[in-house]
Amino acid sequence: MISQSGTILGALISRGAARGIGFSKLVSVGNESDLSVGEVLDLMIDDDGTDAILLFLEGIRNAESIAEAAVRAHKKKKPILAYKLGKSEAGRELAVSHSGALASPGRTTDAYFKRHGIIGVDMLETLFEMPPMVMGRKPEPGNRVCVVTTTGGGAAMVADRLGQQGLELVGPTDRLRERLRRLDVTIGAGPLVDLTMA
């Protein structure tokens, strides 16, 4: 874990521990007056005890060094996940006043993360939930996703998020529908596999 906030590390440790996630290294770079996020990130890539790298960012000071490290991390199949403050105007102002770092608009940061293979997350909790899901896995080609759910409301939230990410929501194949029918599971004709009443 690399953080631009020292105080937040305590909260991050307890949240990670609650999910059974340990940390090989915890580094706070503060306002990066000495070490930068990119420099520490580069060191973590070669650390055998580190399987995934989590970033807590208030702003991005040296985008080039982070980008270069991200390329190396990708080659070593070590995912980088980042939670960045300052997605709103108020959040950007606070981040700048606290660390003095460049707090770019959310869309700019999202594009930067996507370009360099960094997985950006919108919620702090997601920072801890994602590593087990992405470690050692290659991104699947294509942009089609089938959603299996036990709640219509939750599925609608997922569908919303998929649409925002430019992913296509597709229904189950005829083969899957037939397999479910043989198990006495009937699903609707829509693009979701809703098992609420199954």
Task: Identify the residue ranges that each predicted region occupies.
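Catalytic-core regions of core metabolic enzymes
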Residues: 2-198
